[in-house]
Amino acid sequence: MLVRALAVCGVALISASLAVAADNWVGTWKLNAAKSKYSPGPAPKSLTLKFEPSPDGLKLSQELVDAEGKASQGGFVTKLDGKDVAYAGNPDADTASPKRVDDNTYQNTWKKAGKVTITTKVVVSADGKTLTVNQTGTNSKGETVNNTAVYDKQ
């Protein structure tokens, strides 16, 4: 009986620690264009990321207004386990494979038709106020991408 109670407590603690770790990303983040670098440019007019818990892990929703003023939306749901998940609304990818590195960092590989296009590293600052996304690879136009996007928590 004691072993069973300890096992139940262990599962509860693991579940709670996963939820707390995911909380580092949870919230709404707005692009700070002044602190960001887009190569190739230009930077989007606006980009908002929203991370929220979901029954299947962590849900990312994004709203973009590109440099020409065209609006789009997209996102994915992941367990941050490195497995491919559908990525809607991204011209550079149809799947993503986000994987947790630590409580403040995850890496992501974007693929289009099974071919790697862009790799990303997403880091929440120690104070939880800034999210930095570094991207390298090749976009859907065949251009080399080397972006650093900085977001402020709302």
Regions found by a protein language model. Give the residues of each.
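Positively charged n-region of N-terminal signal peptides that target proteins for export
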Residues: 1-5
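Bacterial N-terminal signal peptides
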Residues: 7-16
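Hydrophobic small-molecule pocket/channel-lining residues, especially in calycin-type beta-barrels
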Residues: 20-154
